[in-house]
Structures are given as C-alpha cells and as structure tokens.
Amino acid sequence: MKLAVYGKGGIGKSTTSCNISVALAKRGKKVLQIGCDPKHDSTFTLTGFLIPTIIDTLQEKDYHYEDVWPEDVIYKGYGGVDCVEAGGPPAGAGCGGYVVGETVKLLKELNAFDEYDVILFDVLGDVVCGGFAAPLNYADYCLIVTDNGFDALFAANRIAASVREKARTHPLRLAGLIGNRTSKRDLIEKYIEAVPMPVLEVLPLIEDIRVSRVKGKTLFEMAEQDPSLDYVCDYYLNIADQILARPEGVVPNDTPDRELFSLLSDFYLNPGKPQVPNSEEELDLMIV
C-alpha cells in the first residue's frame, strides 16, 4: 500500500506522517517513509537528525546507480520505520518532481520498493504542480492534512483537484482529511458539505504535538517517558487502523476557488449565532 500525504505548508504534514508511520509499524507493518521536500526534514522526527538525501548520494556516486547500496540511502528510524529523503534540486533550479522520480527509480533498482507493506510519501507544501504531484502517480491513497482554518482548507481544495485529475488515469483515491491541532471543526464540516470526503481524525490543539517536532521525537517516543500522552497516540493508531482497512475512499469534486472563498469567508464572518472568542484555542482562523 502506498500513501501520499499533502497539505498546506507548515500545517504539520511531517509530524503527522511520522506518527502515522509509527502507528502502522505498531500494527505489525513494515513501513518506509519517503520525504519529498528539498528541506529533507520529513523524517527528522523519526531519526532525530537530518539524514543524507538520495540526490546527495547519487551526486557523490556520479549518478552510477550500481554503486549505491540500500544502507547508503535507507536509515532506520524510531519504531522500526525505514526512512528515505529524496532531497531536491538546487534552490531556484530544476524540478522537484524529477527528484521524486529518481528516488523511486533508485529504490526499484535496489529492489527495495516492493519490500514494504506500506510506503508513505510526505510531500512538500500546498503547491501541487505537475512535478510535486508526482507521488500521486504511485499512491493508492492520498491523505490531506488541514486544520480548521481558511487557508488550509483552501489548499486542501486544490489538492483534491489534483487527486481528481490523477484518478482519471490511475487507481488513486482520497482516503480523507486529517485535522491537525485544532480545537474546533466547524469550517472543516462546512467544507466537506460542499466537497464530500471522509474526515479520518481531528487531533487536539495541544502543544506537545508541536514540541515533538522540535525534539525530533514522535508522540509515541515521548509517551514512553510521559504516559499522559498515550491518548494522543490513540488518534494516530485510529488513522492507521482506518487506512489498513483499505477504505473505499473518494474521487473528490473540488469547489471553484471563488465559490469556496465565498463559502468559507461568509461562514466565518456570519456564523449562525454570535460567537465571541474567549481563548487562544478558538482563534484557529486568522484572516490577514
């Protein structure tokens, strides 16, 4: 099974991806997480350091694939999750999608691509150009990470459009949305009224999720020292269980940009009844 995780830049895709990977491993699956971001920090939470990228390794070997060994590019992370970072071209040059293609090509050359029960692609940002939509060509399911905010849902809508386009020629389905660090879900609910799709889980607004990223540890690893975090791990285990059940998923219908802008902004600015935010937790959406 191959998964592609997308979402607005900075929404918490890598943290979410790492915890889902560990949850899948705890369900007895052999998991490979592939970071598809030039920042090459997708797997930092699993390994605790920035691992060398495939592109760096290929450059060192003068692009002689036969000189690359699995241990040169595949690193063991927490929970037994194997980790790969695709890397990227020099800033302002080249195509990230090409890098993803080279990564898959090398892993196939190493006979590694088919050794895993689950391969998870963690893909950069919300700009789903043809290049960075490349992981969708390999994926069975797409997962979109969002929050209860306007911008994240706007990005989710564009990603949904990419899933629909790829599904024309590939057996790809959208598994659903994952709400990350949000105390409310009213805008999420409003969005899925317009664009029906499952919501796999909505993670609570707790600082430990953000802290885990800085520490370079998954929530599961942190919970070993602080059992009070076990309940957070259960959210990721629930997502893993839903994915392993091989859901039917959907081929989404995106809403035109202007229509979605109007829908969400009107809902936010004109709620059904007056609401006065009384804490930081309720300020999930900020329009600037």
UniProtKB/Swiss-Prot annotation:
UniProt keyword annotations, A-Z: 4Fe-4S, ATP-binding, Chlorophyll biosynthesis, Iron, Iron-sulfur, Magnesium, Metal-binding, Nucleotide-binding, Oxidoreductase, Photosynthesis
| Reaction catalysed by this enzyme | chlorophyllide a + oxidized 2[4Fe-4S]-[ferredoxin] + 2 ADP + 2 phosphate = protochlorophyllide a + reduced 2[4Fe-4S]-[ferredoxin] + 2 ATP + 2 H2O
Q: What is this protein called?
A: Light-independent protochlorophyllide reductase iron-sulfur ATP-binding protein
- Residues reported to bind ATP: G10, I11, G12, K13, S14, T15, K39, N180, R181
A Pfam family this chain is assigned to: Fer4_NifH
What Gene3D superfamilies would the database entry show?
P-loop containing nucleotide triphosphate hydrolases (3.40.50.300)
Q: Name one GO molecular function term.
A: ATP binding
Tell me the lineage of the source organism. Bacteria, Bacillati, Cyanobacteriota, Cyanophyceae, Nostocales
Cell cycle keyword on record: no
Q: Which residues are [4Fe-4S] cluster-binding?
A: C95, C129
**InterPro entries from the UniProt entry:** NifH/chlL_CS, NifH/frxC, P-loop_NTPase, Protochlorophyllide_ATP-bd
| CC cofactor note | Binds 1 [4Fe-4S] cluster per dimer.
Q: Would you identify the family this protein belongs to, as annotated?
A: Belongs to the NifH/BchL/ChlL family.
Cofactor or coenzyme needed: [4Fe-4S] cluster
- Under which pathway is this protein filed? Porphyrin-containing compound metabolism; chlorophyll biosynthesis (light-independent)
Q: Does the keyword ATP-binding apply?
A: yes
Which residues take part in binding Mg(2+)? Answer: S14
Q: HAMAP family per the record?
A: ChlL_BchL
Q: What is its EC number?
A: 1.3.7.7
Q: What biological-process GO terms show up in the record?
A: light-independent chlorophyll biosynthetic process; photosynthesis, dark reaction
What does the UniProt record say this protein does? Component of the dark-operative protochlorophyllide reductase (DPOR) that uses Mg-ATP and reduced ferredoxin to reduce ring D of protochlorophyllide (Pchlide) to form chlorophyllide a (Chlide). This reaction is light-independent. The L component serves as a unique electron donor to the NB-component of the complex, and binds Mg-ATP.
Q: How does it assemble?
A: Homodimer. Protochlorophyllide reductase is composed of three subunits; ChlL, ChlN and ChlB.
